[in-house]
């Protein structure tokens, strides 16, 4: 049986670093809620069986009417961490007929620059892989490590950037493998910040697939202006 594709977008975070009272996934960017752009990108990929959005149980900001015409489902099963929300989402995918051998692409709602072309590039690179992998970019900037004992932000040393990549999303893995990896990490007392870290914790080596600068993560207040500029122009294939 051919493995199917599912998308999972954890949306239970509060976006505290963005400096806004409203979670950043619902902030307006280029005339739309930020979440809209990720949903639209996956909706344009008809090969996906379902896109599932996981929100906090007490989320008062989500309004499905703002995403009219897009194909997705919602579950109010967000956890206290990203890892917990993703795990709950993996369990919920079974409601839509997902099996352990099917693929899931986990994507940050705060990366509105994702495009159908990027999604298909990732799927094409990984659909026959034994482990899976992630979108990522080679680190371009010089990296400095801060002196932990410095009160005014002094540099302790410069880190070599050779071989370093910056993780992006989507991150694509088999549902069964990712669930097992997260459960192992939880059992070992580790709350990991992305899915690849959990797969690594299980002893596997995910593959890196070249991403795009437009697929950056909106994190700080000034990032919204950059996202506005990017999303106001058509994506270049």
Swiss-Prot record:
Name the gene that codes for it.
Answer: ispD
Keyword set, alphabetical order: Isoprene biosynthesis, Nucleotidyltransferase, Transferase
Source taxon at top rank: Bacteria
EC number, UniProt record: 2.7.7.60
Instruction: Please identify the protein, giving its name as recorded.
Output: 2-C-methyl-D-erythritol 4-phosphate cytidylyltransferase
The biological process GO terms on file are: isopentenyl diphosphate biosynthetic process, methylerythritol 4-phosphate pathway
GO MF terms on file? 2-C-methyl-D-erythritol 4-phosphate cytidylyltransferase activity
Q: Give the reaction(s) catalysed.
A: 2-C-methyl-D-erythritol 4-phosphate + CTP + H(+) = 4-CDP-2-C-methyl-D-erythritol + diphosphate
Its annotated pathway?
Answer: Isoprenoid biosynthesis; isopentenyl diphosphate biosynthesis via DXP pathway; isopentenyl diphosphate from 1-deoxy-D-xylulose 5-phosphate: step 2/6
Which Cys pairs does UniProt list as disulfide-bonded? Answer: none
Which family does the similarity line name? Belongs to the IspD/TarI cytidylyltransferase family. IspD subfamily.
Site entry (Positions MEP for the nucleophilic attack), positions: 161, 217
Q: What does this protein do?
A: Catalyzes the formation of 4-diphosphocytidyl-2-C-methyl-D-erythritol from CTP and 2-C-methyl-D-erythritol 4-phosphate (MEP).
The annotated site for Transition state stabilizer falls at 17, 24
What is the taxonomic lineage of the source species? Bacteria, Pseudomonadati, Pseudomonadota, Betaproteobacteria, Burkholderiales
What species does this protein belong to?
Answer: Paraburkholderia xenovorans (strain LB400)
């Amino acid at each position: 049986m051919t493995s199917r594709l599912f998308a999972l977008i954890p949306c239970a975070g509060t976006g505290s670093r963005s400096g806004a009272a409203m979670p950043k996934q619902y902030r307006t960017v280029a005339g739309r809620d930020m979440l809209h752009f990720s949903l639209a990108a996956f909706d344009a990929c008809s090969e996906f069986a379902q896109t599932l959005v996981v929100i906090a149980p007490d989320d008062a900001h989500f309004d499905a009417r703002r995403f009219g015409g897009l194909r997705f489902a919602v579950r109010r099963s967000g956890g206290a961490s990203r890892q917990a929300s993703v795990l709950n989402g993996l369990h919920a995918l079974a409601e839509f007929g997902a099996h352990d051998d099917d693929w899931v692409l986990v994507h940050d709602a705060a990366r509105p620059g994702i495009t159908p072309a990027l999604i298909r590039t990732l799927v094409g690179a990984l659909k026959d892989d034994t482990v899976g992998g992630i979108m990522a970019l080679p680190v371009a900037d010089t990296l400095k490590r801060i002196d932990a004992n410095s009160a005014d932000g002094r540099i302790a040393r410069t880190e070599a950037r050779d071989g370093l990549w910056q993780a992006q999303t989507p991150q694509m893995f088999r549902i069964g493998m990712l669930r097992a990896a997260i459960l192992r990490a939880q059992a070992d007392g580790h709350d990991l910040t992305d899915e690849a870290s959990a797969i690594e914790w299980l002893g596997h080596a995910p593959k890196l697939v070249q991403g795009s600068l437009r697929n950056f993560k909106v994190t700080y207040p000034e990032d919204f202006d950059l996202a506005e500029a990017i999303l106001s122009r058509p994506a270049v294939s």
